């Protein structure tokens, strides 16, 4: 073999070796990507948009994780996290109270929406413009002790007699249809979904935010919770996951229509409701945070105020001051 041929063979051999090493490194890098289950609280909706954006835009991949967004099974999303079956889930501060009192190993690590956007909706023709106007009306209830205690405080805060509010079962996943059909007159909803839904369906309605009447009711709902053992053993990974989610919600704040389409892409059952989803997203994109850099952060005074109310009204026996939340991973 000529010298030039030997040189050529040497170069080719070296290049093949480099390619093989590079491929091996790529395989190793892919192997480092950790699969993580994230449990939703309900079917996909605009509370979840930032999660789908984070997945679509590759923010999770940049964090070294492959997050699988899963619908909740019959078992509560919080119970899956408590039992270590998933590290993260969506839940609610008000529902966390009883779990925390029983010693559940969960912590809220990010607030999806800065302020409580839930409240009471009614037909405009019924002229319910204050909580005291619920007196004599049919309220669709889930018969949850915390719900009814809050409603009592709400009505009485404006001088109404809670005992004169007629409570009827609300077993519908969509409260707008039974209100429109007169099954009950009022219901507790989240404006960002059911409130916008009412408008999209042409239901002329009044709406009252709970927080506008009782300051303690400006609690955090929904929130992202995590398993305490997972947080302890995987601090850096948890921080990267939450930071990726934060980027997803920040993107949704700045690009609501594109974010809505990303949600629809991942939840095709919403495709026929695109106009409604976009309106819902436009509303929530302004509610996620007043300052995008502070998305997800908890105000300790507001968190504690609700649990103090819980204790004063017999919902809780234990003092949960400063328990159940952290800003460590979201800042």
Task: Describe each PLM feature range.
Residues 24-26:
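Bacterial signal peptide processing site
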Residues 94-95, 174-267:
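Pocket-lining segment of extracytoplasmic ligand-binding domains
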Residues 232-313:
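Secondary-structure end/capping motifs
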Residues 303-331:
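Conserved C-terminal helix/tail region of periplasmic/extracytoplasmic solute-binding proteins
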Residues 62, 132, 210-217, 285-300:
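Short, solvent-exposed loop/beta-turn-alpha elements that line the ligand-binding surface or hinge
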Residues 32-171, 181, 185-192, 208:
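Short, glycine-/small- and polar/acidic-enriched structural segments
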Residues 1-11:
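Bacterial N-terminal signal peptides that target proteins for export
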Residues 19-22:
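C-terminal motif of bacterial Sec signal peptides marking the signal peptidase cleavage site
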């Amino acid at each position: 073999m000529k010298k030039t041929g030997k040189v050529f063979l040497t170069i080719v051999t070296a290049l093949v070796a480099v390619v093989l090493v590079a491929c091996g490194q790529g395989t190793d890098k892919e192997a480092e990507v950790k699969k993580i289950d994230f449990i939703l609280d309900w079917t996909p909706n605009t509370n979840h948009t930032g999660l789908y954006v984070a997945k679509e835009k590759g923010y999770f991949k940049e964090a070294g994780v492959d997050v699988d967004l899963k619908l909740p099974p019959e078992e509560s999303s919080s119970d899956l996290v408590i039992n270590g079956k998933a590290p993260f889930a969506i839940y609610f501060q008000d529902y966390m109270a009883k779990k925390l009192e029983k010693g559940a190993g969960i912590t809220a690590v990010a607030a999806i929406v800065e302020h409580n956007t839930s409240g009471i909706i009614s037909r405009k023709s019924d002229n319910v413009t204050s909580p005291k106007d619920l007196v004599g009306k049919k309220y669709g209830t889930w018969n949850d002790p915390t719900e009814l205690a809050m409603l009592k405080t709400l009505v009485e805060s404006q001088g109404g007699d809670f005992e004169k509010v007629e409570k009827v079962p609300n077993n519908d996943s969509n409260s707008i249809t039974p209100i429109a059909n007169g099954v009950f007159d009022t219901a507790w909803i989240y404006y960002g979904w059911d409130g916008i839904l009412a408008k999209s369906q042409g239901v002329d309605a009044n709406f009252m935010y709970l927080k506008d009447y009782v300051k303690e009711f400006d609690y955090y709902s929904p929130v992202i919770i995590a398993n305490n053992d997972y947080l302890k053993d995987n601090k850096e990974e948890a921080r990267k996951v939450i930071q990726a989610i934060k980027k997803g919600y920040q993107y949704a704040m700045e690009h609501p229509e594109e974010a809505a389409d990303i949600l629809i892409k991942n939840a095709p059952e919403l495709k026929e409701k695109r106009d409604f989803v976009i309106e819902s997203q436009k509303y929530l994109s302004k509610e996620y945070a007043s300052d995008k850099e502070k998305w997800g952060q908890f105000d300790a005074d507001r968190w504690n105020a609700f649990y103090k109310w819980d204790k004063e009204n017999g919902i809780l026996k234990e003092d949960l001051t400063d328990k159940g939340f952290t800003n460590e991973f979201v800042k």
